[in-house]
Amino acid sequence: YLPNNLERESRQHAIFLFMLCLWMRGGVESDTATIFLKKFHEEKPEYFNPSMYFDRRNITVQGLIDNIKAELIRYRLNQRVEENSIGWVYNMRKLVRHWDSDPRLLMIDKPDFEVLSKRIIGKTRGGNFDFVNEDSPNGFMYFREKMASMIAYFLMDAKLVQLFVTPVPVDFHVLRLLTSNLIIRVKGKDVE
């Protein structure tokens, strides 16, 4: 499912997987999103270059959002397109500004999950929907615990970062199944 024009085990490979996570939040078939994102990368790889979203003259942030939104729709990635176009621009800008345009650096030190979560999860939107927290290296838009685990496993599986211990990405439906079949039991805030 990787784009033909993507060098394996490269920074661009890591960026592709990082951006793919925007569609892994539920509500869309993972394979479908991957196929459409693959085609988008093969035809317009420049949109996967984080610096495109930071040092653009005469283009506002809203202009960048509108531009990527139109491309996402064109490539049939319209599931949550309003959110994902904003997240795309915000996350690319944060990668440029704080992580040398490279998602692998989020995990270069094989962090424990608490550290990884702190780096990836954080407040990103204000009450009036302005970007906030851009000055901090921590916090990517629409990334929660499941996505922090998922990007870690994506990058480890692709041999883009060294293996380290992190929880598996589990969503609400899997947890509901595990608890209803008494595979795990929850007492208060503790899991047995």
Where are these regions (language model features)?
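HhH-family (HhH-GPD) DNA N-glycosylase catalytic core used in base-excision repair
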Residues: 1-192
